[in-house]
Amino acid sequence: MPMYQVKPYHGGGAPLRVELPTCMYRLPNVHGRSYGPAPGAGHVQEESNLSLQALESRQDDILKRLYELKAAVDGLSKMIQTPDADLDVTNIIQADEPTTLTTNALDLNSVLGKDYGALKDIVINANPASPPLSLLVLHRLLCEHFRVLSTVHTHSSVKSVPENLLKCFGEQNKKQPRQDYQLGFTLIWKNVPKTQMKFSIQTMCPIEGEGNIARFLFSLFGQKHNAVNATLIDSWVDIAIFQLKEGSSKEKAAVFRSMNSALGKSPWLAGNELTVADVVLWSVLQQIGGCSVTVPANVQRWMRSCENLAPFNTALKLLK
């Protein structure tokens, strides 16, 4: 297709003459053969390169930390989503052996505070319709470690209390003066929805729930556990209260399976030593009575081991 011809802007080999302004620094010719910096622009590019390098270095550090954080979150996510995560944890708690229950009792002043001239008195309100067996077991264990002044009272909100519950602490010998005891343990049978414990109105609020009170009382024995084992024990206590005691038949069956698996690896639920988890779970099993779920073999063996101990055996007699 024919087109009209346009004259060249510059002809021959004559260089192109363009008047450039003097208010800007000169840039290199992108079509030229030389790729060196333009005259007068070196200091600008050097400063620009240093700032870019610093920015890139910061960006690399941030990205590296983000990748590490993502890897850690992915690892935790896989651990949580694993069905047998709780059972796998029991394999790593063998590194730190817990202290035995019979040799290490805490100084009560370090836990309950120092009160000159006054007996440290723990007051528990419990409903006789649902006696907290775990607290009665712990009372017997406390008596083996400390000089305990034990008393039982009946609140006016309760019309009648069975004779065996009124004598749940046995015949108390109070010939010694009050100041000779290390700890006071007062049980009041009262019409309360949940078991309550009061120790010091000035320094602490009441503790509610059989599991929470059992945790507090068991801490007086001075057992020490690593973080993993302590978490496992707390988990068993919560399972006893919220799943085994208050859960459905399916939840109870799941608890028995978990207990059977754990007791197949160790004589007690959290290792080779008796813990508060064993006390609370045994108590709840006795309270729920004839459960429709079949009790596995390892759990039956564990229950016999508990009942062979005097504190458990004494508490068990209260149900008869």
From Swiss-Prot:
Region (Interaction with PRKN): 82-162
Keyword Transmembrane helix: no
Cited function: Required for assembly and stability of the aminoacyl-tRNA synthase complex. Mediates ubiquitination and degradation of FUBP1, a transcriptional activator of MYC, leading to MYC down-regulation which is required for aveolar type II cell differentiation. Blocks MDM2-mediated ubiquitination and degradation of p53/TP53. Functions as a proapoptotic factor.
PTM description: Phosphorylated on serine residues in response to UV irradiation. Ubiquitinated by PRKN, leading to its degradation by the proteasome. Mutant PRKN fails to ubiquitinate AIMP2 efficiently, allowing its accumulation which may contribute to neurodegeneration associated with Parkinson disease.
Compartment(s) where it occurs, according to its Swiss-Prot or TrEMBL record: Cytoplasm, Cytosol; Nucleus
Transmembrane segments: none
Subunit record text: Part of the multisynthetase complex (MSC), a multisubunit complex that groups tRNA ligases for Arg (RARS1), Asp (DARS1), Gln (QARS1), Ile (IARS1), Leu (LARS1), Lys (KARS1), Met (MARS1) the bifunctional ligase for Glu and Pro (EPRS1) and the auxiliary subunits AIMP1/p43, AIMP2/p38 and EEF1E1/p18. Interacts (via N-terminus) with KARS1. Interacts with EPRS1. Forms a linear complex that contains MARS1, EEF1E1, EPRS1 and AIMP2 that is at the core of the multisubunit complex. Binds FUBP1 (via C-terminus).
Any single GO BP term: apoptotic process
Note: Accumulates in brains affected by autosomal-recessive juvenile parkinsonism, idiopathic Parkinson disease and diffuse Lewy body disease.
Annotated Pfam families: AIMP2_LysRS_bd, GST_C, Thioredoxin_16
UniProt protein name: Aminoacyl tRNA synthase complex-interacting multifunctional protein 2
Primary residence: cytoplasm
